């Protein structure tokens, strides 16, 4: 939940508390001797349990920061896109995104995401403007707070279909769009 930032009309603060639950008795005395489990807490919301990716000795049954990163880009795009469609009188009746990100590791163990690709599959009600629905994906990227805050390319491969009897497949976008994050 955001709170208005004091003295700044259009600024909002977001807070999270992270608690590490991985001390197995000896802290971090060895790399293999501690757990990677943690909880993220937000006022008034359920805790989120997380861990490292299994390649970093994490629990594969828990979400990791990389999962959250890809999901935050995907969900921010979704919410921006739905708002734009509603304002443009485009009736979205279903939306799914098979988003993915590529993390490249350095020899020293660090690294960074190389890119994230969003693959939204959108179903529109009959009578909706399919061409405009395609175009709004780029506008949604420009409006997405998370995408505007990252320094990697966020690619878009939308598929859109009009809900009609017998037409069960989403059509691929006329082109794949690449939206670079702003400096």
Which residue ranges define each predicted feature?
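Extended beta-strand/beta-hairpin segments
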Residues: 1-71, 82-183
């Amino acid at each position: 939940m955001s709170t208005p930032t004091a003295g700044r009309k259009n600024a909002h603060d977001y807070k999270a508390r992270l608690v590490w639950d991985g001390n197995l008795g000896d802290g971090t005395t060895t790399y293999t001797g501690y757990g990677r489990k943690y909880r993220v807490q937000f006022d008034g919301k359920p805790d989120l349990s997380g861990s490292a990716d299994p390649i970093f000795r994490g629990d594969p049954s828990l979400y990791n920061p990389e999962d959250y990163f890809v999901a935050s880009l995907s969900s921010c795009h979704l919410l921006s896109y739905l708002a734009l469609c509603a304002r443009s009188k485009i009736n979205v009746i279903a939306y799914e995104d098979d988003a993915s990100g590529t993390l490249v590791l350095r020899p020293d163990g660090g690294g960074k995401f190389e890119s994230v690709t969003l693959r939204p599959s959108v179903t529109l009600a009959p009578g909706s403007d399919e061409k405009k629905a395609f175009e709004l994906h780029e506008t949604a990227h420009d409006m997405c707070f998370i995408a505007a805050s990252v320094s990697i390319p966020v690619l878009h491969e939308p598929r859109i279909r009009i809900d009609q009897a017998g037409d069960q497949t989403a059509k691929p976008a006329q082109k794949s769009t690449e939206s670079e994050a702003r400096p």
